[in-house]
């Protein structure tokens, strides 16, 4: 499966070796400007992190106040909203669009990973359904493989069935869920809540990446999903 680097590398300031006293003034000025630039970067970064921390603290305080004075259903709705807002902010911090606009290779890998994840999800879902009804899945696998190949996904053909090389889980869901779980572990105690947050993570990711498909021949995730569903419907009986 294609691997995608989600977060930028950390900056590291290395110790500068002592230079002769007769160093050219231009070199001194260049070094001073470099140090100042790095210093300013960390000042801005620290300011942004502080603002975000204060924002989350205020939001949590509001949620706690509501929790003490309202019914359990209302508490759950508000708290779920806080967690989802945190996940949305985490997605913005990953900055998929920004990274893709600067790096065509990253954009291509992202598109392939997203469509491969859609393929994997619906392949498993419909294969399980067809098997439960005693229907041979071979024709279905062959046809969705052709759809994946036509969508521009790289892969390999084995036993006359094409399989995308990057087939697997959506690589962006894990960072969102992991970050939210680390901050709000008490909100992930039930399978229902976990499933709800996973669905939300997938939804906002799919919306976020749509612009990456606007200027290429590949279908959007939503279009590819519809293609797979249409294929599956040909093999699923109308009667339960």
From Swiss-Prot:
Query: What compartments host this protein?
Result: Secreted
Q: Where is this region: GEF catalytic domain?
A: 78-240
From the UniProt record, which GO molecular function terms apply? GTPase activator activity; guanyl-nucleotide exchange factor activity
Task: Say if the entry is tagged with keyword Secreted.
Answer: yes
Keyword check for Secreted: yes
GO biological process terms, alphabetically, are: actin cytoskeleton organization
Please give the chief subcellular localization of this protein.
Answer: secreted
What InterPro entries does the record tag this protein with?
A: SopE, SopE-like_GEF_dom_sf, SopE_GEF_dom, SopE_N_dom
Could you tell me the superkingdom of the organism this chain comes from? Bacteria
Pfam families linked to this entry: SecIII_SopE_N (PF05364), SopE_GEF (PF07487)
The cellular component terms of Gene Ontology attached to this UniProt record, alphabetical and capped at eight, are:
extracellular region
Q: Which UniProt keywords apply?
A: GTPase activation, Guanine-nucleotide releasing factor, Secreted, Virulence
Using the chain's own numbering, where are the disulfide bonds? none
What further fact does the record state? Encoded within a lambda-like prophage region with similarity to GIFSY phages.
* Similarity comment text for this entry: Belongs to the GEF (guanine exchange factor) SopE family.
Protein name according to UniProt: Guanine nucleotide exchange factor SopE
Q: Which organism is it from?
A: Salmonella gallinarum
Ranked from the top, the taxonomy reads: Bacteria, Pseudomonadati, Pseudomonadota, Gammaproteobacteria, Enterobacterales
């Amino acid at each position: 499966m294609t691997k995608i680097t989600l977060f930028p590398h950390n900056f590291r300031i290395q110790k500068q070796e002592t230079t002769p006293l007769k160093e050219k003034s231009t070199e001194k000025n260049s070094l001073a400007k470099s140090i100042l630039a790095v210093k300013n970067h960390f000042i801005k970064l620290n300011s942004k992190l502080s603002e975000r921390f204060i924002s989350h603290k205020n939001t949590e305080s509001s949620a706690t106040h509501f929790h003490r004075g309202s019914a359990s259903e209302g508490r759950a709705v508000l708290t779920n909203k806080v967690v989802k807002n945190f996940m949305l902010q985490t997605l913005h911090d990953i900055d998929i669009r920004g990274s893709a606009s600067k790096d065509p290779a990253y954009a291509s890998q992202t598109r392939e990973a997203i469509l491969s994840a859609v393929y994997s999800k619906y392949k498993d879902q419909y294969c399980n359904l067809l098997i439960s009804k005693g229907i041979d899945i071979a024709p279905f696998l062959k046809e969705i493989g052709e759809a994946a190949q036509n969508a521009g996904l790289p892969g390999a053909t084995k036993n006359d069935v094409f399989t995308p090389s990057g087939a697997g889980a959506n690589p962006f869901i894990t960072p969102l869920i992991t970050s939210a779980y680390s901050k709000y572990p008490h909100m992930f105690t039930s399978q229902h809540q976990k499933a709800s947050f996973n669905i939300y993570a997938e939804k906002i990711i799919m919306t976020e990446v749509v612009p990456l498909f606007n200027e290429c021949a590949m279908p959007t995730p939503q279009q590819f999903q519809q293609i797979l569903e249409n294929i599956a419907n040909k093999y699923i009986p109308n009667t339960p």
